[in-house]
Design a protein with these regions (language model features):
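Conserved glycine-rich Rossmann-like NAD(P)H-binding loop of the short-chain dehydrogenase/reductase
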Residues: 24-39
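Substrate-binding pocket helix/loop in short-chain dehydrogenase/reductase
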Residues: 84-85, 92-97
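Residue(s) in the substrate-gating loop at a strand-loop-helix junction
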Residues: 128
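Conserved glycine-rich cofactor-binding loop
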Residues: 10-11
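The beta1-alpha1 cofactor-binding region of Rossmann-like NAD(H)/NADP(H)-dependent oxidoreductases
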Residues: 48-58, 90
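C-terminal helical subdomain
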Residues: 162, 168-169, 189-231
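Active-site helix of classical SDR
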Residues: 108, 144
Length: 232
């Protein structure tokens, strides 16, 4: 059995990644705070807020105890808002950092050492174009994504030649429900939803990366809508 763990897998990119991995033959463990514990054919759902160390420990204990060390871990869970610096409260900032940066740290810390010990595995980090391009209104989000990029690169260095592969996937805007509150179609300067990437575009890139032969390490993938390419 080839085992994959996907965080934030109840909707959007995470759900699409989980579905594509399952279609590719993986047994997929979906983690999300909105899920209910359960199982189906080649799928296990665990309710887990990845920013909570206790919940992560519970989920990891179940995964490793019942299914083993995963072959693939996709760190995808996160949140998003657009607020200028002066509009972003300390609470806004800390909550977003907890979801987007602390959560991936906890998940990677829980699984990567066991992969290294086994001598194989693949960590996929879902970043963003905001991990290398600055946008007005993204003080907190950019801090989390630049931080995630930095953490991912350090993990890559620390796992070099261990048999564990790492891939950072940095997409431009993806048409998911995180944009509902923003309503980009009504605002100048925003990519219109019809022109955005689909969650499935990102998912297909993830599956492609993790199904390359062991000697091939896909270190980074950047995906942007064609209308967006000059800034990507």
């Amino acid at each position: 059995m080839t085992l994959a763990v996907v965080t934030g897998a109840s909707r959007g990119i995470g759900l699409a990644v989980a579905d594509e991995l399952r279609a590719a033959g993986f047994h997929v463990v979906r983690l999300a705070r909105s899920l209910t514990d359960g199982s189906a054919d080649r799928q296990t759902d665990l309710r887990c807020d990845v920013s909570d160390p206790t919940q992560v420990e519970r989920a990891v204990t179940r995964v490793r105890g019942e299914l083993g060390v995963p072959d693939v871990v996709v760190n995808n869970a996160g949140t998003f808002f657009i607020k200028r610096l002066e509009e972003t409260s300390p609470k806004d900032f800390s909550e977003l950092i907890a979801a987007n940066l602390t959560g991936p740290f906890l998940v990677a810390r829980a699984f990567v050492p066991a992969m290294v010990e086994r001598g194989s595995g693949h960590l996929v980090t879902i970043g963003s174009i905001s991990d290398h391009v600055a946008f007005s209104g993204s003080t907190a989000y950019a801090a989390s994504k630049f931080g995630m990029r930095g953490m991912h690169e350090v993990i890559r260095t620390e796992t070099a030649k261990s048999g564990v592969r790492t891939t950072l996937v940095s997409p431009g805007p993806v048409d998911t429900d995180i944009w509902d509150a923003v309503d980009p179609d009504s605002k100048p300067g925003f990519t219109k939803r019809k022109d955005m990437l689909r969650a499935e575009d990102v998912a297909e890139a993830v599956v492609w990366a993790v199904t390359r032969p062991p000697k091939v390490d896909v270190t980074e993938i950047r995906l942007v809508p064609t209308v967006y390419a000059p800034r990507g």
